[in-house]
Amino acid sequence: MNDEDKVHDISKKIEREKALINAAQAMRQQTNNEQVRSKLDTQMREGRRNLEFFEEKLRELQMRRLGHGVDNMSLGASPMSGSHRQSVDDFEGYGAPSPPPKEDVRGHSSHQSQGSGPLMPASAPYPGGPPDSNVPRARPNYTRLDLIKFDTPHLGPRIQLMLSQIQFKLNVEEQYLKGIEKMVQLYQMEGDKKSKLDAAAKRVESKQKIVLLKQALKRYEELHIDIDVDGPDDDSINLPALRKPLSGTLSIRILAVKDVDHAPLGRFARSPETFIAVKAEDIVVARTKPSRNDKWEAEFHTFPVDKTNEIEFTVYDKPAEHPVPIAMLWVRISDIVEELRRKKIEAEMTSAGWVSADRVGSRAPPPQFPMGAQSPQFAAPPTSPGSQEQNTMIPPQAPPPSQVVSQPVDGWFNLEPYGQIHLSFNFIKGARPQGMDRLGRKGAVRQRKEEVHEMYGHKFVQKQFYNIMRCALCGDFLKYSAGMQCEDCKYTCHTKCYTSVVTKCISKSNAETDPDEEKINHRIPHRFIPFSNLTANWCCHCGYMLPIGSKKNSRKCSECALTAHAQCVHLVPDFCGMSMAVANQILEGMRTQKKTHKDKASSMSERTLRPGSKTSISSGSIAQASTYSGSTAYTSIASPEATEAAKLMYSQTTPRPGGPDRTSTSSTTASAAAAAAMAPKHSSQPSQAGSIPDFGGSPGYGRPDSRDDEYSAQQQQGYGSPQQRKYNPADYANIDAYSSPQARPQQQQQQQQQTPQQVSPMYQQNPQTPISKPQPVAPSYDNQVVPSASGVPVPTKKPLPSATDPGTGMRIGLDHFNFLAVLGKGNFGKVMLAETKKSRKLYAIKVLKKEFIIENDEVESIRSEKRVFLIANRERHPFLTNLHACFQTETRVYFVMEYISGGDLMLHIQRGMFGTKRAQFYAAEVCLALKYFHENGVIYRDLKLDNILLTLDGHIKIADYGLCKEDMWYGSTTSTFCGTPEFMAPEILLDKKYGRAVDWWAFGVLIYQMLLQQSPFRGEDEDEIYDAILADEPLYPIHMPRDSVSILQKLLTREPDQRLGSGPTDAQEIMSQPFFRNINWDDIYHKRVQPPFLPQIKSATDTSNFDSEFTSVTPVLTPVQSVLSQAMQEEFRGFSYTADFE
C-alpha cells in the first residue's frame, strides 16, 4: 500500500468516525433513558478520541510525503529534511529529552584543555553519519501499564500492544475450547453426567470469551494504521530481568466498572448480578461479591503469588443459572512493580527538587518545589550518607526521600472489548534484599557457563524463557518453559528437538563443514518481503514474537508465508516449500542409506582383499592420492588396527583444551586423515577427551565468553592453518579508512601465504627462560597513537603477554609471608594484607580456592586476569594496580599485588561528598587508566567505586581485573552477561553484542555517583535496577553546572554507537569535553597535579580505611578438605610468576 492509498484509507476512517458520532448525537436527543444516554456518551467520547488519532496520523503521513518530496528535489538528503523526518517518525509518546550529539563540542573550542595538543581534537576527526544520525531517537515516556489505562493519550502504541495480546489470547482460547470439547465427548462416552455438565458450562464460557476476543480484535484492527514507524520492539527481545515471573504478595482493590455491555435481559427483569473473578496463572485467587450497580465498597483482596507472570480480571454477568463473561483485562505483575518503582523515585526526586537534564540550569524551579536563593549549586538528598554538612538544598517543608511513602497504583483501566474498571494495586516482593537502593558495596554478577551441546555447528545451551516462544523446528510453543538456544545465532527449539536440527549454524564456515556430512540439495530460497504484522506471528528462527504493526522488523515469505525478523532472514535455510520435519526425515534416510552402503563396502573388502594387498601400494601413490581433495578411494585400504592406531596418534599429537568441540569427531574424517598421513600436528581435528591442554595461553576453561576469544579461534583453526585475525585499527594505520573492496583479496592472499609452521608466540615461549621486561618509563602522549592516512589516530597493537610467563623465575611461596588482616572478600576467595618475613614489605594478596575455580569453570578467567596484570605491569601504569608475584599451593592460587593503604572510593564517598574538583580529578585519572586498557585491547567491565583504590599520595589505582576481556579492539564485540548491576550498560541487559562503549557507560555512572553521591539508576533489587537502566531518565539538581550535565548525558546514552567514547578515537572524545577543560592530561599522567585529598593512616599496617566488616575477621586460611586430582592440578601449570621490580 503506497502513501496515496494510505491517505485514502485514513480519510475513509475519518468520515466513518464522524458519521458514527453524528448518529450517536441524534440518537441521544431522541431518548430519555439515562443508561442509553450514558452508553452513547461513552461512544461519542471514544469516537472523538479515535478521530483525533486518525487526523494526527493523516498529518504525519502528509508531512512524511512532503519530506520525501524535498529529498527528491535536492541532490542529497539535507539536514533539514533529516531532522524533519526525525520529527515525523517519532512515534506517539516519544517525548523524553534526547541527549545531545556526542561530537557536539565545537561550541567550546575556545576552552580546550591545556596541554592536550593534537590528540584531543575539538570534534571527532572521523566522518559523521547521516544528518540526523548523531541525535539518538527519543525514548518512550510511557509504560505498558499506561497503555492499558482507559484515558491513555498513547493510542497508537496501545493499538499495537493489544493487537498482539488479543491475538495470542484468542489462539490460546481456541486451543482451550478444543480440549474442552474432547472432554465433553469423553464424559459422554463414560456416562459421567456431573463432569459432563461442568465441562459443558466451561465450553459455553470459552465460546463467549472467543466472541469477546474477536470483537476486541476487530475493533483494534479497524483502528490500526499501516504506517512505517520505528516503534519499540518489546516482546521480541528476551530481557533477562523484565520477563521474569515474580513472587510476593499482591494487594488488589476493586472499586467499580462502567460502560460494559451487560448480558441481555427480558423487558421486566432486574439488572443482572455482576461479579469479577481474578485469576493468577489460570487459577482463581479472588472473587468479588455480586453487585447490581457496578460498584463495590470494600473489595480488598490480598493473596500470595509464586513465580507469576500475569493477573487476569474477568467481569461476569449472571442473567440465568450460569455466569457469562462480558469483559476482560490482563495485567502483568512486572508492569505493576515497574509503575510502583517509578512513582516512588518520582516522589523522592520531586521532594528533593531534582529535574531531568533539559530543565537543568533554568531559572524557574520545578513547580512542586519552591527553591530558595541560598541553595548551593547541587547537593545530595539528605538521606544519603555524608550529606549532613551540605543539607541546605532541601527546605524544611519538603519531606526527605526516606519519608516518602510509596502510593499504590490507582486508576481506570480499559476492559476488552468494551468498558473500564477502577482498580488499585500494590505489590510487595518476597525475599527482597536490603540496601540495594542506597549507595553501597554491591558484588558483580557474571553469567555462569552452561553445558554446550553442539549440533551442525550450533552451540546449544538450555535456557528458561519467560515469554511465549515457538520452536523453530516443530513449530509448537515452548510456553514458559525451558528450551535450547544457540549461543551464536539464537536458533531456538525444544529440548527434545535440538538433536533433530538439520541447518548449519551461520557461525560455522564452509571450511569447517565435514565433507561427508549429509546435505539436502533443496536450494529454493524464500522470498521475504516486509509486511505489517497485525496478528501474533513468531520468528521461524529465533522463536520470538514479531513486533506488531511495523514493517521495519517483520518479514514474510510471499511463497510459503513463513515469518521472521528482518535481522534473522539471512539465517533461515533455503527450504522454501519444505518443513523442517520433512527435511529431517530426508536427512535421516540419507544417513541410514550411507551407513548401509558403508557396512556393505567394508564387509566386501574384508572378504575379497588378500593380506598382501595392504603393502602393494607405494607410499608415493598414497601421497599422490592425498593431494586430491575429492579423492577418498584410499581411506578404506588400511587395516582397522592401523586405522585405530593412526587415529590414536592423531588425537594425541594435537593437545587441545577439554572444552566443548566446535566440530564433530566423526571416525570417518579421522580415518581419512590417518590414511592420508598429512602432518597430524597441524591438523584442526579436535582432541579426544582427557588430553592434556597446552598452557601457552590457551583458553576455554572458564572464560565467560570464550567463543569470542582470539585463543579459542586459533584452536578452532589449528596451529598450522592460516589464522583469521580480528579487526584492529592498528593493522590499517597506513590504509585509507574507506579503501576499495579490491584491496581485500590481496590481504587475504597474503594471510594464506603464511607458512604452515607459523605458531603464535605464546606457544613458542619457553617457560624456563626469564623474560626481559621493559624499563618502567612513563610513555609520552605524543607517541601513544599512530595517525592513519585517513587522519584517525589508532593505537598500536602490542603483543599479548603469556599466561605462563614466569617473570624472573624466582620462587615465592606461602612461607615467605605473614598474613596481618583481611581487606575484602569476593566470589571465590578474599584479599588479605601480608608482609614479607625478611624485608617486612606490605603486599595485598588475593587468595582463591582451586576447588571453587574448577567447580565454576573459571580456570581460563584466572589466566586472563594474570595476563591483564602483566599488561598493567608492562609500562607500570600509574593508575593501575601492579602485580608482584603469583604462586600456588595444592589448594589455592595467590596474586601478590601492591598494597594500597588509602582504601577505596566507596568508603571515602560514604564519609563525605567529593565536590566537583575532587570528582573531576579522580575521573581524569580513571579515564587515562581506561584509555590504556583500551589501547591494549582490554575492556574492564567492572568499573565502580569499590574497585578504585586511593594511594597515600592522593592518586587512584584501579584494581580487580577478574571481569576484564582481552582482544577487544575497536569494532570487536562480545556478549557475556556480567558486571555490577548499577553499572551495566543497556546493551548488556538486552543480551546484545557489545564492545568498548560499555566501559564509558560505567564511567558516566561513576562520575554521577562521585558528583551526586547516589546512583542514576536505583532500585530495591537487581530487577528494579535493570528496569531503571532501560527506562528511566537520569535526574539532576536544578542548578547543577551545565558542563557536568552535558558529559553525563553523552556518556549515559543508551544507543552504544551514539555514546561518547564509542568512536575509533575512544578516550579522546571524553578528554576533549568541556567538563575537563581545565585538565592538563600530561600533568595528570605524570602526577604533577596536587591531589585534592590525602588519606590518613596511623601506621603502615593501619587498615582503618577499609571496611570493618572485613578487617575484623581473623586473617587465617580456612582448611580445605577436598583433594584435587593430578588432572585438576595440571590446569594451573605455569601460573607462578615473579616481577622484576619490588
Curated annotation (Swiss-Prot):
- Record-listed E.C. numbers: 2.7.11.13
Q: Which domain of life is it from?
A: Eukaryota
Signal peptide residue numbers: none
Q: Which GO terms describe its cellular component?
A: cell septum; cytoplasmic stress granule; cytoskeleton; nucleus; site of polarized growth
Q: Where does ATP bind?
A: 823-831, 846
Q: Does the keyword Transferase apply?
A: yes
Question: Can you provide one Gene Ontology molecular function annotated for this UniProt record?
Answer: diacylglycerol-dependent serine/threonine kinase activity
Zn-finger (Phorbol-ester/DAG-type) residues: 457-505, 525-576
- What residue ranges carry the coiled-coil annotation? none
Which top-level enzyme class is recorded in the Swiss-Prot or TrEMBL entry?
A: transferase
Q: What are the boundaries of the region Disordered?
A: 70-139, 357-403, 592-622, 651-807
* Ranges of compositional bias, category Low complexity: 663-677, 712-724, 741-765
Reactions catalysed, as given in the entry = L-seryl-[protein] + ATP = O-phospho-L-seryl-[protein] + ADP + H(+); L-threonyl-[protein] + ATP = O-phospho-L-threonyl-[protein] + ADP + H(+)
The protein's matches in SUPFAM superfamilies, at most eight in alphabetical order, are given as:
C2 domain (Calcium/lipid-binding domain, CaLB), Cysteine-rich domain, HR1 repeat, Protein kinase-like (PK-like)
The Protein kinase domain sits at 817-1076
Write out the biased-composition intervals (Polar residues).
385-394, 613-622
Q: Give a Pfam family name.
A: C1_1
Alphabetic keyword roster: ATP-binding, Coiled coil, Kinase, Metal-binding, Nucleotide-binding, Phosphoprotein, Repeat, Serine/threonine-protein kinase, Transferase, Zinc, Zinc-finger
Q: What is this protein called?
A: Protein kinase C-like
Report the source organism: Neurospora crassa (strain ATCC 24698 / 74-OR23-1A / CBS 708.71 / DSM 1257 / FGSC 987)
